[in-house]
Amino acid sequence: MERDFLGAIGRKEEAAGKPEEHSDYRGGGGGASAAMQWQFPATKVGAASSAFMSFRSSAAAAREEDPKEAAVFDRFSLSGFRPPPRPSPGDAFDGAAAMKQRQFGFNGRQQYAAAAQHGHREQGVDSYGVAAPHHFPSPSPSPRHPVPFGHANPMLRVHSLPNVAGGSPYRNQSFSVGNSVAGSTVGVYGGPRDLQNPKVTQMTIFYDGLVNVFDNIPVEKAQELMLLASRASIPSPPSAARKSDSPISAAAKLTVPEALPARQIVVQKPEASVPLVSGVSNPITIVSQAVTLPKSSSSSNDSAGPKSGGLPLAVTPLSQASPSQPIPVATTNASAIMPRAVPQARKASLARFLEKRKERVSSVAPYPSSKSPLESSDTIGSPSTPSKSSCTDITPSTNNCEDSLCLGQPRNISFSSQEPPSTKLQI
């Protein structure tokens, strides 16, 4: 039935003629009113075609006759767009072309641009032709989404309302891929929102097997703490060790003023006197060293005499030292400080040992011999033979009771308790 109607329209076009057709186009372009009569009788097909009638150019109507191009046109069309029909009298279009014009695709932009040149601007066609490139973006990848959307996406459809005042078409807000408002923010750094995170910082300190976490620690405070920790990790100089021994040195100075060099010897080796005192390998050598000690140092403290054996080889024996050589003061002071380093139990055992040795010496030789001290020192060197002049040697190093016992016996050398003994041992 379409073919018969198409043929009827073709015959009436030939009868109308081309000048009349051009005059109709000029009348339509002159802004004619919408109340115009349709010159063809209203049939079923004609009524259906007139409802969807739109403006077309002659070149577009010629291309509609090609079936291949029409198939491509229908394939890429958007069915949502319905342009308002504004027919003009004497406009000779075929009904089949009007049925196919219900939808328009990418060719529609060219058709409406051509129709806009003929003066059909009051129906919003020109505005759509200008805005069409924005609604149909090119398939070039956008900076945020590398995969473009398809052109047949329903989000890209543009709908028009023919009843809007002013005759301008109504277009929905389409979704644009590169829109800055509705664009995706995946992978985009949000600067203002993340600027507050560096202010809330935490500091973790591992100390003494504990983990300490502190909040809101600025960078300057953390650097200051690390600087203090680095200073504390440096080993202390040797002067700190000397300061720690200051109470001991003060006590030693109260007892003996010259005790500073002797104190260092005692602190370094406090246990050196234990094996030498307990051993009885050379007791006479120890006693022979005590001969040159002054009387005041031995009588000032009762226990100074027995503890004088704590210095094993600090003083040379009488056989090696000259008669006029005095003993250093540090050695005498060390003998006075030595009881402080020895415990009380060892002090008692040492006192018992010295008493028994004194009894053995007095029982072997109760009377002193007339030999010189130099000759007696030769016999002192041998541990097997006891010395006969041991009473003279032991007397200064013992306590007061020993002095009274030995002073009652006849001696060649006499010591006075009021004056220090002389270093000359000649008769």
From Swiss-Prot:
Q: Where in the cell is it found?
A: Nucleus
Task: Print the keywords alphabetically.
Answer: Jasmonic acid signaling pathway, Nucleus, Transcription, Transcription regulation, Ubl conjugation
Q: Where is this region: Disordered?
A: 1-33, 293-327, 360-427
Give residue numbers for sequence motif Nuclear localization signal: 345-352
Its transmembrane ranges are none
Q: Does the keyword Ribosomal protein apply?
A: no
Q: Where is this motif: Jas?
A: 343-367
Q: Share the record's PTM remark.
A: Ubiquitinated.
**Compositional bias annotation for Basic and acidic residues:** 1-25
Give any Pfam family that matches.
Answer: tify
User: What SMART domains does the annotation carry?
Assistant: TIFY (SM00979)
Domain Tify: start-end pairs? 196-231
A GO CC term attached to the entry = nucleus
- Chain intervals with Polar residues compositional bias: 293-303, 317-327, 369-402, 411-427
Q: What is known of its domains?
A: The jas domain (343-367) is required for interaction with COI1.
Q: Which PANTHER family match?
A: PROTEIN TIFY 4A-RELATED-RELATED, PROTEIN TIFY 7
Q: Function of this protein?
A: Repressor of jasmonate responses.
Query: Into which family does the record put it?
Result: Belongs to the TIFY/JAZ family.
The name of this protein is Protein TIFY 6a
Tell me the organism. Answer: Oryza sativa subsp. indica (Rice)
Q: What is the lineage of its organism?
A: Eukaryota, Viridiplantae, Streptophyta, Embryophyta, Tracheophyta
